[in-house]
């Protein structure tokens, strides 16, 4: 339970509940990066990540320990459901730290200077993973309205995951959060209905329906 009434936690919880109705045997991994943020990427982290695994010193493995856990969770997942509120037009720093920790050379993207063409390539392109971003926004009109072009939440998340090869991306958002009036309640109702439909659609797609 969130004491501050997080809309994104409410939507992500609803999606999981709906998913379990369609996929009762699904294994759920829950990670709250808002309450327990991953460590930020540092120079030591980058040095450790770009050092071949067989050459890493003990301190390097320790620096990458949380990143390895997050990458393992990502690799094990069929679907990633992320509650990502909008903070100043972009994702929270805690969620950006999660992104930085899963974009890992040799694990989620490849790099080879001798490779013809681009030296980078996605390592998750054939994994059939899906991502669902459930967001909340204080203002309104981000989808084709007066704030169109100001939303950097979904673009930031989807760009990073597309770089890794995850291209099946979906999103829903609550707006009018700062107004707290009937428009917010209507937006919540629409988002919840959208969550229900999306969970049903994605579950059906898993079974070729």
Give, region by region, the residue ranges found by the protein language model.
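Short histidine/acidic/glycine/proline-rich micro-motifs that form metal-
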Residues: 1-3, 140, 178
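N-terminal beta1-alpha1-beta2 submodule of the flavodoxin-like/Rossmannoid cofactor-binding fold
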Residues: 1-107, 193-209
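Short secondary-structure boundary/capping segments
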Residues: 20, 72, 121-124, 162
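Residues at the starts of beta-strands that form the adenosine-phosphate
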Residues: 25-27, 129-130, 168
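Structural beta-sheet core signal
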Residues: 82, 131-135, 171
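Short, structured loop/turn "capping" segments at alpha-beta junctions
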Residues: 105-110, 167
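Short, glycine-/small-residue-rich phosphate/pyrophosphate-handling segment
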Residues: 111-160
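Glycine-rich phosphate/pyrophosphate-binding loop and the adjoining helix
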Residues: 143-209
């Amino acid at each position: 339970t969130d004491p501050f009434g997080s809309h994104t936690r409410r939507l992500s919880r609803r999606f999981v509940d709906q998913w379990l109705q369609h996929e009762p045997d699904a294994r759920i991994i829950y990670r709250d990066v808002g309450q327990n943020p991953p460590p930020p990427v540092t120079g030591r982290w980058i040095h450790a990540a770009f050092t071949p695994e067989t050459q890493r010193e003990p301190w390097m493995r320790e620096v990458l320990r949380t990143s390895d856990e997050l990458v393992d969770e990502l690799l094990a997942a069929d679907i990633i459901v992320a509650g990502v509120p909008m903070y100043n037009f972009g994702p929270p720093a805690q969620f950006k730290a999660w992104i930085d920790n899963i974009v890992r050379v040799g694990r989620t993207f490849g790099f080879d200077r001798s490779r013809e063409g681009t030296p980078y390539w996605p390592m998750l392109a054939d994994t059939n993973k899906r991502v669902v971003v459930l967001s909340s926004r204080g203002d309104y009109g981000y989808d084709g309205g007066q704030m169109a072009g100001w939303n950097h939440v979904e673009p930031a998340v989807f760009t990073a995951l597309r770089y890794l090869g995850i291209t099946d991306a979906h999103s829903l958002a609550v707006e009018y959060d700062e107004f707290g009036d009937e428009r917010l309640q209507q937006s919540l109702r629409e988002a919840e209905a959208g969550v229900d439909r999306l969970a049903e659609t994605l579950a059906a797609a898993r079974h070729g329906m």
